[in-house]
C-alpha cells in the first residue's frame, strides 16, 4: 500500500465534500468516502495482510487520512446547515408591518342579551335575581302553585316527567314547566318583603316549529309585601314595557284565570308597530298585531292566598303580585323574528347581526 494511494483517497474525499452543495449531496459523499465500502475503509482492512514491519507505518497513514476526512466532513456539514438555517429564516420571515387578518367578532345570543336587559330593568327597581333547579319536585312545580292533581298541565301531554330509580314510573320530579317554582323557593327561604325576578329555561312537550319549541326561556316576577294591589302590578308592567319599547307604550289587563293568582289577567301591550292605528282602518293593516292594536305578552295577577299559605305567609297581612312571559316571544316582537327555530339552531348568521347589544 503506497503512501501516494492513501493521499489520493484522502484528497478525493475532501474534494467530494467541498463539491457538495446540499446536505443531501453531502450525505451521498459521506457514504462513498467514509462508509464500509469506501476506499479508506477497504485500505484499513488490508493493513492486516501487510508484513509486520509495514503495518505500523501503513496504519498511521490510513488513520491520519481518515481523521482528516472526518474532520472535513464535519466542517462541511456545519457550513451547509448554517446556510440552510439562514435560507429558512429568509423564506419564512414575517413582515410585522403587514396588517393582520381580521378575526370575525362574535356576538352574544340575543336571548341572553334580552334576558339580561330585562333583569337590569328590575334590578334597578330593587328586585333580586333568583334561580332554581330545572329538574324540579312536583310539589314546587304544581302543588304549591294551587295546580291540583287533576289539572291538565300535570298530564304527560304537557310535561316531561323524570323516571324513578331503576326505570320506575314515578320519581316525583319533572322538568319545570315554568320558573314559578323559583318564586315558591324564594318565598319559602327569604325574609319578607320579597321582590324577585326569576329568569331561566323551561320545558314543555311541544314539537319544534315556527312558533313552538320544547325548551324555551321565561322571566317571572314575584313581589310580596304589605298593601300591594293591582295598581302596583299595573305600574310595574308599564315601567317594564316602556323601558323595552319606548315611553309612549301602554299596557292593558284582560280578565283571565290562573290557579296561582286571584284575580288573574292577561297582559297586553300597545302594538309597537302601528300604535293602534290599524284598528278599524283597512287601509293600514298591521301584520304584527293582526290589526287589533294590542299584542299579548303574558299572564299576571295577585298571588292566590292559597299559594301564600303554602309558603307559610299570612295572606291576611301580606299580599303579592306576579307575572311571567316568554323571552322568545318578546324577542320575536322586538326584532320581527318570524320563525322560532332560528333561535335554537345555533346559526351564526342569526346571532351576528345583533352584535353585543340589542
Swiss-Prot record:
SUPFAM superfamilies to which the protein is assigned, alphabetical: Class II aaRS and biotin synthetases, tRNA-binding arm
Entry EC number(s): 6.1.1.20
Subunit structure: Tetramer of two alpha and two beta subunits.
Name of the protein in question: Phenylalanine--tRNA ligase alpha subunit
Listed Pfam families: Phe_tRNA-synt_N, tRNA-synt_2d
Ligand binding (Mg(2+)): 262
Example of a GO MF term: ATP binding
Top-level taxonomic group: Bacteria
A single BP term in Gene Ontology: phenylalanyl-tRNA aminoacylation
Record's keyword terms, sorted: Aminoacyl-tRNA synthetase, ATP-binding, Cytoplasm, Ligase, Magnesium, Metal-binding, Nucleotide-binding, Protein biosynthesis
Family: Belongs to the class-II aminoacyl-tRNA synthetase family. Phe-tRNA synthetase alpha subunit type 1 subfamily.
Cofactor note: Binds 2 magnesium ions per tetramer.
One annotated Gene Ontology cellular component of this protein: cytoplasm
Protein localization: Cytoplasm
Catalysed reactions, as listed in the record: tRNA(Phe) + L-phenylalanine + ATP = L-phenylalanyl-tRNA(Phe) + AMP + diphosphate + H(+)
Cofactor(s) required, per the database record: Mg(2+)
Native source organism of the sequence: Streptomyces coelicolor (strain ATCC BAA-471 / A3(2) / M145)
CDD domains hit by this protein: PheRS_alpha_core
Amino acid at each position: 500500500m503506497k503512501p501516494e494511494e492513501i493521499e489520493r483517497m484522502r484528497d478525493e474525499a475532501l474534494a467530494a465534500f467541498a463539491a457538495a452543495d446540499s446536505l443531501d449531496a453531502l450525505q451521498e459523499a459521506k457514504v462513498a468516502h467514509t462508509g464500509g465500502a469506501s476506499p479508506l475503509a477497504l485500505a484499513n482492512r488490508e493493513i492486516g495482510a501487510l508484513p509486520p514491519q509495514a503495518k505500523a507505518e501503513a496504519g498511521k497513514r490510513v488513520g491520519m487520512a481518515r481523521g482528516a476526512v472526518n474532520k472535513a466532513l464535519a466542517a462541511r456539514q456545519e457550513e451547509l446547515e448554517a446556510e440552510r438555517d439562514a435560507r429558512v429564516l429568509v423564506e419564512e420571515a414575517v413582515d410585522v408591518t403587514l396588517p393582520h387578518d381580521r378575526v370575525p367578532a362574535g356576538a352574544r345570543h340575543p336571548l341572553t342579551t334580552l334576558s339580561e336587559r330585562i333583569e337590569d330593568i328590575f334590578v334597578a327597581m330593587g328586585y333580586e335575581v333568583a334561580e332554581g333547579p330545572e329538574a324540579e319536585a312536583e310539589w314546587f312545580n304544581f302543588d304549591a302553585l294551587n295546580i291540583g292533581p287533576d289539572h291538565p298541565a300535570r298530564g304527560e301531554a304537557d310535561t316531561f316527567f323524570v323516571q324513578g330509580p331503576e326505570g320506575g314510573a314515578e320519581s316525583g320530579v319533572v322538568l319545570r314547566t315554568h320558573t314559578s317554582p323559583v318564586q315558591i323557593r324564594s318565598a319559602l327561604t327569604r325574609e319578607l318583603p320579597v321582590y324577585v325576578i326569576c329568569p331561566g329555561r323551561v320545558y314543555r312537550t311541544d314539537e319544534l316549529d315556527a312558533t313552538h319549541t320544547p325548551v324555551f326561556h321565561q322571566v317571572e316576577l314575584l313581589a310580596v309585601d304589605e298593601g300591594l294591589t293591582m295598581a302596583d302590578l299595573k305600574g310595574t308592567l308599564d315601567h317594564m314595557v316602556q323601558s323595552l319599547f319606548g315611553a309612549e307604550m301602554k299596557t292593558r289587563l284582560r280578565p283571565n284565570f290562573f290557579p296561582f293568582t286571584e284575580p288573574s289577567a292577561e297582559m297586553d301591550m300597545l302594538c309597537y308597530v302601528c300604535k293602534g292605528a290599524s284598528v278599524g282602518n283597512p287601509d293600514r293593516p298591521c301584520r304584527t298585531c293582526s290589526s287589533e292594536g294590542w299584542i299579548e305578552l303574558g299572564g299576571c295577577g295577585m298571588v292566590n292566598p292559597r299559594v301564600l299559605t303554602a309558603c307559610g305567609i299570612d295572606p291576611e297581612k301580606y299580599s303579592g303580585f306576579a307575572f311571567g312571559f316568554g323571552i322568545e316571544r318578546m324577542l320575536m316582537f322586538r326584532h320581527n323574528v318570524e320563525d322560532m327555530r332560528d333561535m335554537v339552531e345555533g346559526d351564526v348568521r342569526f346571532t351576528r347581526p345583533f352584535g353585543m347589544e340589542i
